[in-house]
């Protein structure tokens, strides 16, 4: 039981996460349609969204890779099944 508790405390990805990654997704108020990624703190994943081009916040990344590196650090990258791998 103690082992499981320690495992979950260490495995919590929000521990030490970049504060920008905890900001909410903001689509922006302009009408452009830029595909972007943000860190979803509920699902604990980088997810795709459509950015309007202005407004927004720092939780807005041009690629899945950029989001993952910024929010998880230089760990192994796991690409979602529905996204192509980015170079």
UniProtKB/Swiss-Prot annotation:
Residue stretch(es) of the prosequence: 76-87
GO terms assigned for molecular function: potassium channel regulator activity; serine-type endopeptidase inhibitor activity; toxin activity
Main location: secreted
Domain BPTI/Kunitz inhibitor: from-to ranges: 21-71
Entry-linked SUPFAM superfamilies: BPTI-like (SSF57362)
Subcellular location, record wording: Secreted; Nematocyst
GO CC terms: extracellular space; nematocyst
Record flagged with keyword Disulfide bond: yes
Site (Reactive bond): 31-32
Annotated Gene3D superfamilies: Pancreatic trypsin inhibitor Kunitz domain
Signal peptide: 1-16
InterPro entries the record matches: Kunitz_BPTI (IPR002223), Kunitz_BPTI_sf (IPR036880), Prtase_inh_Kunz-CS (IPR020901), TFPI/VKTCI-like (IPR050098)
Tree of life domain: Eukaryota
Disulfide bonds: 21-71, 30-54, 46-67
Keyword terms of this UniProt record: Disulfide bond, Ion channel impairing toxin, Nematocyst, Potassium channel impairing toxin, Protease inhibitor, Secreted, Serine protease inhibitor, Signal, Toxin, Voltage-gated potassium channel impairing toxin
Coiled-coil zones: none
Family of the protein in this entry: Belongs to the venom Kunitz-type family. Sea anemone type 2 potassium channel toxin subfamily.
Other remarks on this protein: Negative results: does nos affect the inward-rectifier potassium channel (KCNJ2/IRK1), as well as Kv1.1/KCNA1, Kv1.2/KCNA2, Kv1.3/KCNA3, and Kv1.4/KCNA4.
Function summary: Kunitz peptide that directly activates neuronal GIRK1/2 (KCNJ3/KCNJ6) channels (EC(50)=80.9 uM) resulting in larger K+ currents. This activation is independent from Gi/o protein activity, and has only a minor effect on Kv1.6/KCNA6 channels (13.5% inhibition at 1 uM). Serine protease inhibitor that inhibits both tissue and plasma kallikreins. Has hemolytic activity.
Protein name listed in UniProt: U-actitoxin-Avd3n
Natural source organism: Anemonia viridis (Snakelocks anemone)
